[in-house]
């Protein structure tokens, strides 16, 4: 997928890279509906940052498997080489030792899958932040598509309440970006496609800019198997 616009979002995240208050360590939450481009944004920003970065996406699986895969990512080893951790607290302790004082980005995507597998994950992460990460050079970013669950993380009842140093709710792409995707389409066609796909990057990418809007509707929308 080509990277288009997101200037405000990139400005926010780039500011995070150099912010010294409340400290060099930063704890950011990014959320938004599915397919709005959260993962693509974070991967692009992390790659362009020029510093070490780790991306991990939680899956619908057991907590021990999630912990093992996360540590493998952070420690740059295979899952088979990664030890088993009995708890999230044990895992975060190990990750804190691996990271140390090195400046780096750690992205935890689809976080609700991890908390669904073991609700204790959040309190363990809160403890790790308080005891280790907030005193480090780490930029920790958590991300998720379950908007209500992600908003709950910011409530007073959440273990993570008061820990976030920044938050961003990612919106669909604005209308003007459609001209970049479809430079040869008329304004009317771009208005029409906006009403159909709603500025969602993943859906925009399904459309062929070399074909007319009508042709795209016939191929991609009336015959949804074409998008599978």
Identify the residue ranges that each predicted region occupies.
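Phosphate-binding site recognition
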Residues: 1-228
């Amino acid at each position: 997928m080509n990277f288009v616009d997101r200037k405000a979002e990139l400005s926010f995240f780039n500011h995070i890279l150099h912010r010294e208050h409340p400290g060099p360590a930063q704890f950011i939450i990014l959320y938004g509906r599915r397919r709005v481009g959260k993962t693509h944004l974070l991967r692009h920003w992390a790659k362009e940052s020029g510093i070490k970065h780790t991306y991990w996406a939680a899956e619908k699986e057991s907590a021990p498997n999630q912990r093992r895969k996360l540590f493998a990512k952070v420690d740059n080893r295979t899952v088979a080489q990664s030890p088993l951790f009995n708890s999230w607290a044990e895992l975060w302790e190990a990750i804190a030792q691996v990271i140390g004082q090195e400046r780096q980005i750690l992205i935890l995507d689809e976080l609700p899958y991890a908390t669904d597998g073991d609700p204790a994950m959040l309190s363990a992460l809160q403890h790790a932040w308080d005891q280790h990460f907030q005193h480090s050079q780490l930029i920790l970013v958590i991300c998720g598509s379950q908007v209500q669950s992600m908003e709950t993380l910011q409530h007073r009842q959440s273990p993570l309440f008061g820990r976030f140093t920044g938050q961003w709710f990612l919106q669909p792409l604005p209308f003007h970006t459609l001209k970049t995707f479809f430079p040869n389409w008329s304004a009317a066609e771009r208005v029409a496609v906006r009403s159909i796909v709603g500025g969602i990057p993943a859906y925009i990418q399904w459309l062929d800019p070399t074909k007319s809007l009508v042709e795209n509707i016939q191929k991609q929308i009336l015959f949804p198997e074409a998008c599978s």
